[in-house]
Amino acid sequence: MSKSFQQSSLGRDSQGHGRDLSAAGIGLLAAATQSLSMPASLGRMNQGTARLASLMNLGMSSSLNQQGAHSALSSASTSSHNLQSIFNIGSRGPLPLSSQHRGDTDQASNILASFGLSARDLDELSRYPEDKITPENLPQILLQLKRRRTEEGPTLSYGRDGRSATREPPYRVPRDDWEEKRHFRRDSFDDRGPSLNPVLDYDHGSRSQESGYYDRMDYEDDRLRDGERCRDDSFFGETSHNYHKFDSEYERMGRGPGPLQERSLFEKKRGAPPSSNIEDFHGLLPKGYPHLCSICDLPVHSNKEWSQHINGASHSRRCQLLLEIYPEWNPDNDTGHTMGDPFMLQQSTNPAPGILGPPPPSFHLGGPAVGPRGNLGAGNGNLQGPRHMQKGRVETSRVVHIMDFQRGKNLRYQLLQLVEPFGVISNHLILNKINEAFIEMATTEDAQAAVDYYTTTPALVFGKPVRVHLSQKYKRIKKPEGKPDQKFDQKQELGRVIHLSNLPHSGYSDSAVLKLAEPYGKIKNYILMRMKSQAFIEMETREDAMAMVDHCLKKALWFQGRCVKVDLSEKYKKLVLRIPNRGIDLLKKDKSRKRSYSPDGKESPSDKKSKTDAQKTESPAEGKEQEEKSGEDGEKDTKDDQTEQEPSMLLESEDELLVDEEEAAALLESGSSVGDETDLANLGDVSSDGKKEPSDKAVKKDPSASATSKKKLKKVDKIEELDQENEAALENGIKNEENTEPGAESAENADDPNKDTSENADGQNDENKEDYTIPDEYRIGPYQPNVPVGIDYVIPKTGFYCKLCSLFYTNEEVAKNTHCSSLPHYQKLKKFLNKLAEERRQKKET
C-alpha cells in the first residue's frame, strides 16, 4: 500500500498540484470509493459515495473543483496498473458530486474488507486533519477507529448513517414526485459547497464529535431521496451474499448501546425523519423480505420475525429516541400528508406493548398511495403515529391501559383504585399471564382525565410505579358472551367481606373479634377460623368494609398482642348458605315452630328455643354420619336425601362455592372456645337403628356457622327475637351449653315417630322409666365435677369430636377431661343412656 501511495504522489506532482504522499493516497482512496458507490448510512450499494469522496479527499483544498480531482485520479491511474484494474477508473470521465452511478458491489465490498473499513469508519476518517494522516500512521488510525467502534457499539441510524447492506429492495418515490419534494432540500449538492468547508478545513481539536456528526447527518434526507429514485429489481441478487459479512460486523459492534449512550449520540433535529423511519415507526408490514428496520438497523426475514421485533423493548425504546430527536414531529397530527392507505394499519401486527403503547386503529385518510407501505411523502413533517403522548384521536377510546405492574393480593382492587376517583368504571379486564390490565370508563373524558393525571403524577400499584395510558387499540371491553345481561358493578365485584389474618389461635370469643369491626358499620355475617388464625366478616355495605380496610392501612390493628392484617377479601364476595332457599325455609319453619309450642311454665325462653330447635334435629346416628362427611370430606352432597337437605354454612365466591377440606374443618373446629352456640344439638349416636323423620331435619351449626346463619335470620322478617338470643349466646358460651340439654332430649324423642309428642308427654315418659329396672350398663351415678364420664363418646376426627354435644376440640386433654367433666355433657349423657334403656324396655315388651 505504501508503493501505491508513492505512485499516486508522483502522478499528482506531474500534474503540478504539489500534493504530499498522504494527501494523494487518501484522495485516491476517496475517488475509488466514489466510483464504487459505497453507502455511508443505509447499507445500500447505491448512494452517498460522492459525499464520502469529498470528505475523504483531505489533500485537496476547498477550492479544488471536480475536474481537478479527476485529473489527479487520471495521473494516479496511469502510474499504477494494479490500482487501475482494481478500481476500474481509468476510462471514467468527470463525475459531479451530485450525480449517481451504479458501482460494482462485489468489488466495493472486497475493497472495504481489504482496508478493514466500514461505512462509519470512512466518515470517522474524514474528520482527521490532513497533516496527521501519513502512510505510516494510517494503519494505526484505522485500528483506533475499529477499537473505538467496538467500544461504542452500533449507533441508531434513524435513516442517518451506519446502515448495512442488508436493506430490502429500495422502494423509491417516482421521479416526478421526487422533483416536487425537492423544495424540502435547502440546496442541491452543487450549491452546498460552502457548507462543506467546516468538514474539509477544520481544526480537529476545536470541534467535538457531536458537531461533526451533526454536519454529516444533514445530508441524509437528500441522499435518501436520491437513492430512492433508482429502482433496481436485481438489487437483492447482487447483495445477498454480503449479508453474513455485514451482519457479523454488526454483531462485533454490539447489538445496542444503553439508553443514556444512545441519547448522547444524537442532537435534536428539525422537521420529520425520513419516510423509512416513519414506516418502521408505525410498524407497517414490509412488502418484501429480508427487510432492515431503519430505526434499529436490524434485518428481519419474515412476518413473524417482524412482529416479534416491533413488539420488543429495544424497538420501542428506539422509537422513543426517534421522537426525542425530532421534537417538532407530531405523528398524530392529522394535518398535511397522512398515511393514506387505510388497510395498511389493519395489517400491522404491532400491538406496541412497550413505551409507545398500542398503535391506532384503522382510519380512512385521503390522498393517493405514493410510498410502498402507505401514502408517505418524502420527508414531510406531519404524519400519523402511535405516540400515546399525543391527543389526536383519544376521544374515541375510553379504555385505560395499565402496564408493568407486579401481581399481589387484591390486585384488582389496587388497579381499580387508580382510576376510580376519575369516574364510573364500566368494565375491566386483567390479563393472566401478562402484567397488563384494561379498565373501561363510563366516558371518554373520565379516561382522558385519568391518563392526564398520571402523566405528571406517578401511578403506584403495591408501591411500585406502573405505566398508564389510553388504549387506542381497544375502544371498548365487551361483556362476556355467557353473561350478556349481567350488569357490571365494580362495588359488587369487589364484595364487602373483610379478611382478618394473623389472629391468635385461642383465648378469645367471637364477640371480641366482631367488636373490631363494629365501629365501622353493621355486621351482616361472619365466619371465624381459629385453626387458620383468620376470620371473614361481611359488612352490610361495601363502604363500611372499605372504611375499615383504609383505616387499618393507616393505623395497624392490634388484637391480644398481635398485629392483625386487614384487607378486602378478593376470594369471597359474600357469606351465604350453600342452599340458600332451603336454608331460609328451614329457618322460617324454625320460627313458626318456636312460636307454636308452649313450654312449661318452669322452663326458660332458652329452654323453649332449644326444644323447638331440637325437634328438627336428625337422629344421632345420622348426625354422626353427616358430621364425618362435613369434617373429613367437605363435600356438598351426601348419599341420602336427608343429608342433601342440610344447608351447611359455607363461604361462597361470586362464581362458585370456594371451600376446601381445611376450611370446612376450620369452621367446625372454631366452636370449642365458645361452647355450643348453635342451640341445635346434632347428637352422634353409637346406635344405628334409630329411625329418622325427613321433615324434622335441622341445621347443624358450629359457632362460626351459627354466626353465619345470622345473615339469613336477618333476611327473614319477624325473627328479631331469635337474633337477640343468638347474640346473647355469643356472650355466654356456658349458658348455651346448658340450654342445649333439653334440646337433646327433644331430638331423641323426634327420632322415633311414635314419640313425636309434646314436652308434657316427654316428662311423663321420664317418670315411667323410673318404674322399671335399668341395667347397670345404662346406669350413671350422681354428677361429680372432676370425674369424667362417657369418654368413649369422644372420638378423634379433624380434632376430637363429642358425639353427644356435637363439639370439636383440638386438644385431647381438654376434650376428655375438661369437657367430659362439664355438667352439660353429664346431663346429655344421662338422658342419652335413659333413652337407650327405654328402647331396650320397649323391645322386651314387644
Swiss-Prot record:
Acidic residues composition bias: which ranges? 652-664
UniProt short sequence motif Nuclear localization signal, positions renumbered to this chain: 709-717
Domain RRM: start-end pairs: 398-473, 496-571
Residues modified as Phosphoserine: 4, 9, 14, 22, 41, 118, 126, 157, 164, 188, 195, 206, 208, 211, 234, 264, 275, 509, 511, 533, 596, 598, 604, 606, 653, 670, 672-673, 688, 746, 758
One of its GO biological process terms is:
blastocyst formation
Question: Which of the residues bear the PTM N-acetylserine?
Answer: 2
Bias-annotated ranges (Basic and acidic residues)? 160-174, 201-213, 600-642, 688-703, 766-779
Q: Where are the zinc fingers (Matrin-type)?
A: 800-831
Q: Where is this cross-link: Glycyl lysine isopeptide (Lys-Gly) (interchain with G-Cter in SUMO2)?
A: 3, 132, 146, 245, 269, 478, 487, 491, 515, 522, 554-555, 616, 629, 718, 735, 769, 835
Give the top-rank taxon of the lineage listed in the UniProt record for this protein.
Answer: Eukaryota
> Gene Ontology cellular component?
nuclear matrix; nucleus
Q: Which residues carry this modification: Phosphothreonine?
A: 150, 678, 740
In its UniProt record, a GO molecular function of this protein is:
miRNA binding
Extent of the signal sequence:
none
Q: Which SMART domains match?
A: RRM (SM00360), ZnF_U1 (SM00451)
Keywords linked to the UniProt accession: Acetylation, Immunity, Innate immunity, Isopeptide bond, Metal-binding, Nucleus, Phosphoprotein, Repeat, RNA-binding, Ubl conjugation, Zinc, Zinc-finger
Stretches with biased composition (Low complexity): 665-675
Where are the stretches annotated Disordered?
A: 147-174, 187-213, 342-394, 588-779
**Name of the molecule in the record:** Matrin-3
Q: Which organism is it from?
A: Mus musculus
